[in-house]
UniProtKB/Swiss-Prot annotation:
One of its GO terms (biological process) is proteolysis. This is Serine carboxypeptidase-like 47. Probable carboxypeptidase. It is found in: Secreted. It comes from Arabidopsis thaliana (Mouse-ear cress). GO terms for molecular function: serine-type carboxypeptidase activity. One of its GO terms (cellular component) is extracellular region. Residues 1-22 form the signal peptide.
Length: 505
């Protein structure tokens, strides 16, 4: 794969040889070199066919090999750095606090976590939002530049204001995590995380340091958001924050809610929806559907074993269950499984190369304080290190949160196959919590944007589900205005079964 290419989410798809590679990575430090070799040609061809093998495996920096940046936070002016022709169009960057920084993780040998922070274009009392991109191992800069960040990237690599950036209604943080993702790095491979305990503890430590650095935001409402594999990260972090607050471990974090977009949260239920969704969208035949039902029985059984015991059986669960997805994709040549309306043209279904080129420019790296570190958009080593986490059910962490009044929004674009709305709606419906019966009997109502139907909404108490029309896996990219209205209404407690006609800009 060429240096400019990468793939955004790398969910679900690999062969048995790819699974066995996880053991070699974790037991062989030589794997943490600038390239990753696979013993099986078939595995490599499969992975490349789905754009799952980034060129750069992970940012593991040998000790003493470069003058790695120390823990810093600095104010940045992206528009000036990019030499943007239209820098004068829109608000002045100087009006807001735009920051980039590193956080030295305390429970690691040498890990540094990179982040961006953008103060609200509206007012500093707006909620604080953290965004987590999935993968696992994909940089949150993907969302920042192509979905809901303050800026978009032009063809000439200049930047321009995003009219529907989430910083219009929130003070927003984008974190490169787990360690080894994006500009985050370590000099010791043992810092690479392999489960949600490690990931959520690192993020909790980061948030403690963030609020210590920015005390004026401590009392603001706080929301956790993200998409795709962040369907694992988000419940784990919400649970960790809630637990830390209860135990008075540090600075109280004013957690009000968490939102999962087209996420992977309960694999056992969601894999069962693949065949039904594919049939509904005419991707497969009735006979294909019947065959997939049998495959799902095996998937369901082994996923239950994974949830009970973890370990190697979870590797096997990924192999067994992803065969369902692979069989569907094989039926439609060139299918973009993140948006089934579109063709996956060329080597990538989406071209996000502008971001990699921009962030690897010398003047940009200098402005961000990242030294000579090469930007890694999606890390195959981080992805592989989390392999035994994939089939774990993170829904189990949610009932105690919503029962305590912490709001949950699950939203999904209707044309995404890989984390489809049907599978997400099923685990939400089946979740055992105090309001399950009330949610089950709640009516669906239209979600309106500018007076037009933009989705279908269901709500009861702290739980909301939203099916977003005319969107795929990345809702803020496909429906930027609707996603901004969704966020604002939800944070204000207005994303309810009573239609909301508009939002304030």
């Amino acid at each position: 794969m060429e240096a400019k290419t990468f793939f955004l989410f790398m969910l679900f798809i690999f062969s048995q040889s790819w699974l066995s590679t996880s053991k070699r990575i974790l037991n062989n430090p030589s794997v943490f070199s600038s390239s990753l070799n696979f013993s099986s040609g078939n595995a490599e061809r499969l992975i490349k066919s789905f754009n799952l093998m980034p060129k750069y495996d992970v940012n593991v920096i040998p000790k003493g090999s470069l003058d790695a940046p120390r823990l810093i936070e600095r104010q940045i002016d992206f528009l000036a750095t990019a030499g943007s022709k239209n820098a004068s169009v829109g608000p002045s960057v100087q009006e807001f606090g735009h920051y980039a920084g590193y956080y030295s993780l305390p429970h690691s040998k040498s890990a540094k976590m990179f982040y961006f922070f953008f103060e609200s274009r509206n007012k500093t009392t707006d909620p604080v939002v953290i965004w987590l991109t999935g993968g696992p191992g994909c940089s949150s800069s993907v969302a920042m530049f192509y979905e809901n960040g303050p800026f978009k990237i032009s063809k000439d690599l200049s930047l321009y204001w995003n009219d529907f950036g989430w910083d219009k209604v929130s003070n927003i943080i984008y974190v490169d995590q787990p360690v080894g993702t994006g500009f985050s790095y370590t000099s010791d491979e043992s810092d690479i995380r392999n489960d949600e305990d490690g990931v959520s503890n690192d993020l909790y430590d980061f948030l403690q340091a963030f609020f210590k650095e920015h005390p004026k935001f401590v009392k603001n409402d706080f929301f956790i958001t993200g998409e795709s594999y962040a369907g694992h990260y988000i419940p784990a972090l919400a649970s960790r924050v809630h637990s830390g607050n209860k135990k008075k471990e540090g600075i109280p974090i004013n957690l009000k809610g968490f939102a999962i977009g087209n996420g992977l949260t309960n694999p056992e239920i969601q894999y069962g929806a693949y065949g039904d969704y594919a049939l509904q969208m005419k991707l497969i035949s009735e006979s294909d559907h019947e065959s997939l039902k049998q495959d799902y029985v095996e998937c369901q059984n082994i996923t239950k074993k994974c949830s009970l015991g973890g370990g190697l059986v979870c590797d096997s669960a990924v192999e067994v269950c992803t065969s369902i997805f692979n069989k569907i994709v094989a039926k439609k040549s060139g299918l973009n499984y993140y948006d089934i309306r579109k063709k996956c043209v060329g080597s990538l279904c989406y071209d996000f190369s502008r971001m990699e080129i921009f962030l690897n420019k010398e003047n940009v790296r200098k402005a961000l304080g990242v030294g000579d570190i090469k930007f890694v958009s999606c890390s195959s080593t981080v992805y592989d290190a989390m392999i035994e986490d994939w089939m774990q059910n993170l829904e189990v962490k949610i009932p105690s949160l919503v029962n305590d009044g912490i709001n949950l929004l699950v939203y999904a674009g209707e044309y995404d196959l890989i984390c489809n709305w049907l599978g997400n709606s099923r685990w939400v419906d089946q979740m055992n919590w105090s309001g399950q019966k009330g949610f089950g009997s709640a009516k669906n109502v239209s979600f309106l944007v500018d007076g037009k139907e933009a989705g279908l909404l269901k709500n009861h108490g702290p739980l909301t589900f939203l099916k977003v029309y005319n969107a795929g896996h990345m809702v803020p990219m496909d429906q930027p205005k609707a996603s901004l209205q969704m966020l604002q209404n939800w944070m204000q407690g207005k994303l309810r079964t009573t239609p909301v006609l508009g939002f304030s800009q």
